Amino acid sequence: VRGLAVSQRHPYLFSAGEDKLVKCWDLETNKVVRQYYGHLSGIYALSLHPTLDVLVTAGRDASARVWDMRTKTQIHVLGGHRGTVASVACQEGDPQVITGSMDATIKLWDLAAGRCVTTLTHHKKSVRALALPPHEFTFASGSAGGHNIKRWRCPEGTLMTNMTHEGIVNTLSCNADGVLFSGADDGSMQLFDYATGVPFQSMRDTVQPGSLDAEAGVFCSAFDQTGTRLITGCADKSTYAILTHQRSRSTARHERGELFERERQASEFVGGVLAAVEGDALCHTGEGRS
């Protein structure tokens, strides 16, 4: 299972995985109520539209697909990428759909027409992560190489800021207080001031006993609804809970994040976990079938 999303408008959780399926789970009954068919290969990411009953999925078949959440109808196939679409994000304003691909490009899409309006080619390597800050009309993207985190202005896709995280960035998350988190394939983690692009803290994953040194990668991340707790999923079958103190508005300075909890997951999660935080609930998935 590669992706999770929890609806803010319905009691539904959506999951997507290497089996080319998207499943809709009723959180009140813990049962699958809908399945969405159409991808030709594994699905790597999914995102829910914040105001419409629309689901967007992306995967290894180099496409993103737009679904009617209720009827399971495939509305659009968003083609044009030349490689795996590794990340997707939806927002209320235009562009309502943003995709990042292994072909090192980002595409901004007109949701109503199902067509690409802008292709951003500033990244030199695969774009694996996207993040939408809740406090402003911009987005961030992450890849590998120098200046591998970029901040863009919507709707045009104008480049605003370059940030650097040494390593292959797998995940980005941003909270309403302007803290941007990035996690990389080598286990390194950084916190940035989103407005300025200045890093103010670095951390590193230490692999758990019984895991290989190569299993230090950070695969996914999500802030809780308060924006003060960050959950990360790692390749060594564990999750981090990181306390990111709120920024002081008067001094515009961030306090240092503090690791306050770590949990070792069951042994079947051999490839890492994905996390989504809703209130006090935590969902995580791995390379197993759950």
Language-model segments: which ranges?
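WD40-repeat beta-propellers
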Residues: 4, 22-25, 46, 64-68, ...
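Eukaryotic tandem repeat interaction scaffolds
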Residues: 84-89, 93-185
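Terminal intrinsically disordered, low-complexity extensions flanking WD-repeat/beta-propeller proteins
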Residues: 166-168, 175-179, 187-188, 195-290
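A conserved positional marker within WD40/Gbeta-like beta-propeller blades
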Residues: 12, 21, 32, 40, ...
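Conserved strand-to-loop turn within each blade of WD40 beta-propeller repeats
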Residues: 9, 16-19, 27, 51, ...
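Short coil/turn segments that connect the beta-strands within blades of beta-propeller domains
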Residues: 9-11, 51-53, 93-95, 135-137, ...
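WD40/WD-repeat beta-propeller blade N-cap
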Residues: 1, 37-43, 79-85, 121-127, ...
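A structural motif specific to WD40 beta-propellers
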Residues: 31-34, 73-76, 115-118, 158-161, ...
